[in-house]
Swiss-Prot record:
Name of the protein in question: RNA guanine-N7 methyltransferase activating subunit
Residues modified as N-acetylthreonine: 2
Motif RNMT-activating domain per UniProt: ranges: 36-42
Biased composition (Polar residues): 76-93
Modified residues (Omega-N-methylarginine): 85
The organism of origin for this protein: Homo sapiens (Human)
Residue list for modification Phosphoserine: 36, 86
Pfam families: RAM
UniProt feature, compositional bias: Basic and acidic residues: 57-70
């Protein structure tokens, strides 16, 4: 096995004229006409191949409408689901004073103070 120190000068000598005017193979490659890019049809279609050129794209999302014609999940009636009842706990939903762990300082972990503060 050859040493790296010996191999580097050999490779530099072998490829000294690579990608230059003296490289005949590269010059032939440059003379070729450019290849056309691949054509990918219907790359953003959701339903498969039989949905070509649908005019109104808004109709694709009809099944996601809720009961009162709002956008959301099917039959999304979360607003009137509980009818004012609590979720099963009697704990207050908001604390009187906000709880911030003080181990990271005023601006939190990995946050910077506002520009010009330093």
């Amino acid at each position: 096995m050859t040493d790296t120190a010996e191999a580097v000068p050999k490779f530099e000598e072998m490829f000294a004229s690579r990608f230059t005017e003296n490289d005949k193979e590269y010059q032939e490659y440059l003379k070729r006409p450019p290849e056309s890019p691949p054509i990918v049809e219907e790359w953003n279609s959701r339903a498969g191949g039989n949905q070509r050129n649908r005019g109104n794209r808004l109709q694709d999302n009809r099944q996601f409408r809720g009961r009162d014609n709002r956008w959301g999940w099917p039959s999304d009636n979360r607003s009137n689901q509980w009818h004012g009842r609590s979720w099963g706990n009697n704990y207050p939903q908001h604390r009187q004073e906000p709880y911030y762990p003080q181990q990271y300082g005023h601006y939190g972990y990995n946050q910077r103070p506002p520009y010009g503060y330093y």
